[in-house]
Amino acid sequence: MGFVPMAPLLADAKKDSYAIGQFNINGLQWAKAILAGAESQQSPVIAAASDRLIDYLGGFQTVVAMMGALTDELGITVPVVLHLDHGLSIERCKKAVDAGFSSVMFDGSHYPINENIDMTKEVVAYAHAHNVSVEGEVGTVGGMEDGLMAEIKYADVEECQRFVCETNVDALAAALGSVHGKYKGEPKLGFNEMAAISASTNVPLVLHGASGIPDEQLQRAIKLGHAKININTECMIAWSDACRTTFAEQETAFEPRLLLQEGLAMVQATVEKKIKQFGAANKAAGSASLQRR
């Protein structure tokens, strides 16, 4: 079947005011749950592997081979984007492109804006030459991401405008108050800044750290141009809670397939719930003609 680039999917989502969910792969069974959830809802889906998890999953080529085989064996018909999340370097992004990923994120948000722009431009030039989409980041999303703690640094409107103009990225992750991991208290997104950035850049925005954000805020973010919403912690909590219950109720069981079954079912259920919440259900039909890698 092949993977589709992210850019045209996000353009459609932004135009029609819905968002496509990004769900992180944490192994083969998780990938099956994500794909099955998207297929059941007839929604495009972004299956992501964070750079710090690539080696755990077996490497770039292993991830591409696994996801390609699964989409074929499971008869997946909806558009699937295979995305590198939080690419750590230019070289790692290029490796993902060469391996067959259809989208990459270069995370240069920890660098000064000039360096972030220069490095992102190099990634964009290489990726676009291979029909691969690119997401960039300005500002810093707080919380824990793959073992690294980051403080929130709000994106600057003028820096975002300059970043998009000079790099030609397909999507922008602008840090606006969300955090990776669990929230302490109710999340408070910067909607005034969000509106200004959306108006000045005119590219699809990406909301990182969306697990746990109330629906009212998510819907407002979608209306203000967020066409991609990243969910990982919510799936992990659903999985771990279900697995803990299974282990407690079946103390003598030892077969992994049975012990993990309910947890994986909860991952799929969470994917389906978020797709509906984002308004992406039944949006796959208009994407059949997309060029695939």
UniProtKB/Swiss-Prot annotation:
<dbReference type="GO" id="GO:0006096">
    <property type="term" value="P:glycolytic process"/>
</dbReference>
<keyword id="KW-0456">Lyase</keyword>
<feature type="modified residue" description="Phosphothreonine">
    <location>
        <position position="233"/>
    </location>
</feature>
<feature type="binding site">
    <location>
        <position position="86"/>
    </location>
    <ligand>
        <name>Zn(2+)</name>
    </ligand>
</feature>
<keyword id="KW-0597">Phosphoprotein</keyword>
<dbReference type="GO" id="GO:0004332">
    <property type="term" value="F:fructose-bisphosphate aldolase activity"/>
</dbReference>
<dbReference type="Pfam" id="PF01116">
    <property type="entry name" value="F_bP_aldolase"/>
</dbReference>
<feature type="binding site">
    <location>
        <position position="208"/>
    </location>
    <ligand>
        <name>Zn(2+)</name>
    </ligand>
</feature>
<comment type="pathway">
    <text>Polyol metabolism; myo-inositol degradation into acetyl-CoA; acetyl-CoA from myo-inositol: step 6/7.</text>
</comment>
<feature type="binding site">
    <location>
        <begin position="209"/>
        <end position="211"/>
    </location>
    <ligand>
        <name>dihydroxyacetone phosphate</name>
    </ligand>
</feature>
<feature type="binding site">
    <location>
        <position position="180"/>
    </location>
    <ligand>
        <name>Zn(2+)</name>
    </ligand>
</feature>
<dbReference type="GO" id="GO:0008270">
    <property type="term" value="F:zinc ion binding"/>
</dbReference>
<protein>
    <recommendedName>
        <fullName>6-phospho-5-dehydro-2-deoxy-D-gluconate aldolase</fullName>
        <ecNumber>4.1.2.29</ecNumber>
    </recommendedName>
</protein>
<keyword id="KW-0862">Zinc</keyword>
<feature type="binding site">
    <location>
        <begin position="230"/>
        <end position="233"/>
    </location>
    <ligand>
        <name>dihydroxyacetone phosphate</name>
    </ligand>
</feature>
<comment type="function">
    <text>Produces dihydroxyacetone phosphate (DHAP or glycerone phosphate) and malonic semialdehyde (MSA or 3-oxopropanoate) from 6-phospho-5-dehydro-2-deoxy-D-gluconate (DKGP).</text>
</comment>
<comment type="similarity">
    <text>Belongs to the class II fructose-bisphosphate aldolase family. IolJ subfamily.</text>
</comment>
<feature type="binding site">
    <location>
        <position position="181"/>
    </location>
    <ligand>
        <name>dihydroxyacetone phosphate</name>
    </ligand>
</feature>
<dbReference type="InterPro" id="IPR000771">
    <property type="entry name" value="FBA_II"/>
</dbReference>
<feature type="active site" description="Proton donor">
    <location>
        <position position="85"/>
    </location>
</feature>
<dbReference type="GO" id="GO:0030388">
    <property type="term" value="P:fructose 1,6-bisphosphate metabolic process"/>
</dbReference>
<keyword id="KW-0479">Metal-binding</keyword>
<dbReference type="InterPro" id="IPR011289">
    <property type="entry name" value="Fruc_bis_ald_class-2"/>
</dbReference>
<dbReference type="InterPro" id="IPR013785">
    <property type="entry name" value="Aldolase_TIM"/>
</dbReference>
<dbReference type="InterPro" id="IPR050246">
    <property type="entry name" value="Class_II_FBP_aldolase"/>
</dbReference>
<dbReference type="GO" id="GO:0047441">
    <property type="term" value="F:5-dehydro-2-deoxyphosphogluconate aldolase activity"/>
</dbReference>
